[in-house]
From Swiss-Prot:
This is Putative oxidoreductase C6G10.06. One of its GO terms (molecular function) is oxidoreductase activity. Its EC number is 1.-.-.-. The chain crosses the membrane at residues 11-31. It comes from the Eukaryota. Belongs to the TDA3 family. Keywords: Cytoplasm, Membrane, Oxidoreductase, Transmembrane, Transmembrane helix, Transport. The keyword Ion transport does not apply. Its main location: cytoplasm. It holds the Pfam family DAO. It comes from Schizosaccharomyces pombe (strain 972 / ATCC 24843) (Fission yeast).
Length: 376
């Protein structure tokens, strides 16, 4: 079959990347009449596993706050879509969807002015607390388990007929996706023909399409249990000054999970990204540094148990600093570069990208700010 023919009048859409944006795009394609009429075939190409990259974190925030005016409409739409998905598929049960309180805490090693700490944050070191203030209201922040979300939605779209192809994608073009099937020799190369190609491969987008400027911010993560203190549904941005009077602060974001566990996220740094996600090597001292900070932040009465440590790559655009939701000059669609906001903005990105793939005159929000003159 030629790349431009229509087998049974079906349009083949190939999506590179089985993370949250690729999954959401496929889902919203299946919601369109063209799919329900049997006019589309959708294929997701994934190298390792569903949500195997940055979408595989156990807890993440959803909010439209703390963002610039360019990307805020994307988050506003996404939050409405998350609410709809929660009602339709019982997100509270299936991906731990819940509202959360958010706090900013400033702590100091040699603190002399102790601030009041809310009852829900008694697991923090009170003696070092200089400032503790709420961010927004209870309705401004929500949380989900992105990995569970992706796995649930992947099963849902598979029921609807979306096909998953596991293998390492080597090259993409408007009408072809070249890949090596999983667990096959490197010289086992398959060139799949499609009519439209979307690359939503997170930080690995930059390897397939270097001109996009997509790179990976590496973030260390530590997972702890604190069974003797109920942590509630809380998000804490904590700034700790360990250098006396110097204005040098180390920052960590803390997310609660299952009301008895905490996830500490360190400072993102640009890191050499391997071409294969299975070959990621990291500096263990970054985990040690984050663990030292957790020891200083947690109350001495908090009985914490170390559960796990990991690193995740956040895809970011080094050209604009905002997401790319666009097509290249050669006709390849791109959705990547959301950095910290990829989980929040995924449903809106997926919906708009589905509309673009189907050639709609207008998308659900104005995506012009996310268009770039990409490629050759």
């Amino acid at each position: 079959m030629s790349a431009t023919s229509r087998e049974g009048n079906k349009t083949k859409i190939g999506i590179v990347g089985g993370g949250i944006i690729g999954i959401c795009t496929a889902f919203y394609l299946t919601e369109e009449q063209e799919y329900k009429k049997g006019e589309l075939d959708i294929f997701i190409f994934e190298s390792k596993e569903i949500a195997g990259g940055s979408s595989g974190i156990d807890s993440a925030i959803l909010t439209k706050l703390c963002q610039n005016e360019i990307i805020q409409p994307l988050s506003t739409l996404a939050l409405k879509l998350y609410e709809g998905l929660d009602k339709k598929f019982d997100g509270k049960k299936n991906w731990e969807y819940r509202t959360a309180n958010s706090w900013f805490c400033k702590m100091k090693w040699d603190n002399t002015n102790v601030a009041k700490v809310p009852d829900t944050l008694q697991w923090l070191q009170r003696e070092r607390m200089q400032k503790c203030s709420s961010i927004g209201s209870g309705n401004d922040f929500a949380m989900i388990n992105p990995k569970l979300f992706c796995q649930f939605m992947a099963k849902e779209i598979e029921k609807r007929g979306v096909k998953f192809i596991f293998g390492s994608v080597k090259e993409v073009s408007k009408h072809h996706i070249t890949y090596v099937p999983k667990q096959e020799a490197e010289d086992t190369i398959i060139k799949a023909q499609v009519h439209k190609t979307l690359v939503s491969a997170g930080p690995w987008t930059g390897y397939l399409l270097p001109f996009t400027g997509i790179a990976g911010l590496c973030i260390p993560i530590i997972h702890l249990s604190v069974g003797n203190f109920p942590v509630g549904d809380s998000i804490v941005v904590c700034c700790l000054n360990t250098m006396g009077n110097l204005n040098i602060c180390k920052t960590t974001e803390i997310f609660s999970k299952n009301r008895e566990q905490l996830i500490f996220m360190g400072t993102p740094k640009f890191h050499l990204l391997p071409k294969d996600s299975n070959r990621c090597f990291f500096n263990p001292f970054e985990i040690i540094e984050l663990k030292e900070m957790t020891d200083l932040v947690l109350s001495e009465n908090t009985k914490s148990n170390y559960l796990d440590a990991s690193f995740k790559f956040l895809p970011t655009s080094r050209i604009t600093g905002i997401p790319i939701i666009s097509t290249t000059k050669s006709g390849v669609f791109v959705a990547a570069g959301h950095a910290n906001w990829g989980i929040t903005q995924a449903p809106a990105t997926g919906l708009c990208m589905a509309e673009m793939l189907l050639g709609k005159e207008k998308t659900s929000i104005n995506t012009d700010p996310f268009h770039l003159n990409l490629g050759e």
